[in-house]
């Protein structure tokens, strides 16, 4: 008869591994699962839903941080500030669509000069007339 006790030669109990580490994620799967359950989005929450949501959130965070890091490097800075996040999000078409209604605190505005306010390009026509005078 097979007993239910400890197996012969079994050492200490197996160390617990988090669902985040099982999925290879940095974002907390357990915490997201708790928020999904407490938020009453549905009566029941499947086992894969918090893992998938954590993966999506981690990907979005990595994408924004990479673009913000590039913006910081372009401005010769080593620290990402809200301005760099604003520039990163607004310069990316898909992130702008996703976060279009969001306001980033201390992000500033995108630099933009309307075309009618820019000076006319008269230099090109003068250069062509100067070439005619030389001949």
Curated annotation (Swiss-Prot):
Species name: Oryza sativa subsp. japonica (Rice)
Source taxonomy: Eukaryota, Viridiplantae, Streptophyta, Embryophyta, Tracheophyta
KW DNA-binding (keyword) present: yes
Function: Core component of nucleosome. Nucleosomes wrap and compact DNA into chromatin, limiting DNA accessibility to the cellular machineries which require DNA as a template. Histones thereby play a central role in transcription regulation, DNA repair, DNA replication and chromosomal stability. DNA accessibility is regulated via a complex set of post-translational modifications of histones, also called histone code, and nucleosome remodeling.
Record-annotated disulphide pairs: none
Keyword Nucleus: yes
Cellular localization per UniProt: Nucleus; Chromosome
CC annotations in GO: nucleosome; nucleus
Gene Ontology MF: a single term: protein heterodimerization activity
InterPro entries: Histone-fold (IPR009072), Histone_H2A (IPR002119), Histone_H2A/H2B/H3 (IPR007125), Histone_H2A_C (IPR032454), Histone_H2A_CS (IPR032458)
Matches recorded under Pfam families: Histone, Histone_H2A_C
GO biological process, one term: heterochromatin formation
Family label: Belongs to the histone H2A family.
Protein name (record): Probable histone H2A.7
SUBUNIT field: The nucleosome is a histone octamer containing two molecules each of H2A, H2B, H3 and H4 assembled in one H3-H4 heterotetramer and two H2A-H2B heterodimers. The octamer wraps approximately 147 bp of DNA.
Keywords: Chromosome, DNA-binding, Nucleosome core, Nucleus
